[in-house]
């Protein structure tokens, strides 16, 4: 059921901001590309694009009269934002406070967790080593629970994160 409900978009910020994958239904994704960290981290510009895309998507659903679940914006970074990110972090946090989206910040290796946390109403979590597989399994299980919930506004109990996060 989640594969029919979940859409995925990927935007990278390795040196420059690139929309790697426009919103695509999960069941239509047959393989995953590998992304390598490189260059500067224009996280502010990447988040601006991500927020714009999410707002465009939810507006299209509203216009078509389609019910949708609160979108999740997963932000994964391995460093420190290298552009002007403070204004867009306030925008993301405001949208999260208004319950228009969930922002899930995740730090890898030497990521600046304080900067990542500024984008969300919840603190950033640090990925334990390189447990990306465990993280994406957790994310998939979480999305399955959300899409199986009875209502688009219902609070959903998510699985524990101990398989992938470090304390």
Annotate the PLM regions.
Residues 31, 109-167:
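Von Willebrand factor A/integrin I-like adhesion domains
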């Amino acid at each position: 059921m989640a594969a029919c409900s979940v859409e995925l978009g990927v935007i990278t910020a390795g040196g420059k901001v690139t929309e790697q994958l426009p919103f695509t239904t999960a069941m239509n994704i047959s393989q995953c590309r590998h992304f390598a960290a490189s260059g500067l981290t224009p996280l502010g510009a990447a988040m601006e694009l991500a927020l714009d895309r999410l707002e465009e998507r939810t507006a299209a659903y509203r216009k078509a009269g389609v019910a949708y679940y609160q979108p999740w914006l997963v932000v994964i970074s391995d460093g420190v934002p290298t552009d002007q990110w403070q204004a867009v972090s306030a925008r993301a946090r405001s949208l999260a406070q208004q319950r228009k989206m969930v922002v899930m910040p995740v730090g890898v290796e030497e990521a600046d967790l304080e900067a990542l946390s500024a984008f969300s109403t919840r603190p950033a979590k640090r990925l334990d080593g390189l447990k990306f597989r465990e993280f994406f399994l957790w994310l998939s299980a979480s999305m399955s629970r959300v899409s199986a919930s009875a209502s688009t506004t219902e609070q959903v109990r998510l699985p524990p994160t101990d398989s992938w996060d470090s304390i």
